[in-house]
Amino acid sequence: MKFAEKLLKHPEFLQLQKRVQEMEQDRIYCHHELSHALDVCRMAWMMYLEDEYKTHLKDYRQKKEAKVEVSEQKYRAEIAGQYITDLQTDDADHTEKPYLNADNMLAKKDQFYVTGLLHDIGRVAQYETGEHHSVAGVRIAEKLLTEIEYPSEWMRETLQIVGVHHGREETDGEFSRMEYYIRRADHLSRNCFFCEASDSCKWKKEERNQTICW
């Protein structure tokens, strides 16, 4: 993950991670240090992969229900064959296809991880100045992303997610797929069922996680 690695080695990113860890040392509620960011990255990516698998499975079942004589073995061979073809075709258009080749998958994973790593990057600014972390986060993230030469075609979506990820409830309007997974992972990564501060937590009882999901 080229850009995630660059971000993890960026001095300002590391400094902010250390600073937020120090500032939240005595905090009884949810923390926002690197371990949480990585939880969000991993959970969001797993959710995405699970849904991709379900999409393939649904497609296969629909073919069977339509009495298309495609055995499971033949179906897998077809997908594998197309996968090999895509790998060998540099200019292939994958945007409308229900599967990802290896290069696309690695690139998407990189984008997921960079976005997850940055989603709470504005916390230090919020603690120090009162500026909301989503607002500060967009400003800081844009600077960091520019300095690691993050792809311009990914920039807008990542900054959008950094700016709105904190909402726990569904809102009007459409989310990008990555935004949907990052928002869910940010919420579901919290172990409310094992939290000693739950009695005074600002989350409503129905919002609290009662078990593990991923």
Task: Set out the residue ranges of the language-model regions.
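Metal-dependent phosphohydrolase cores
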Residues: 1-214
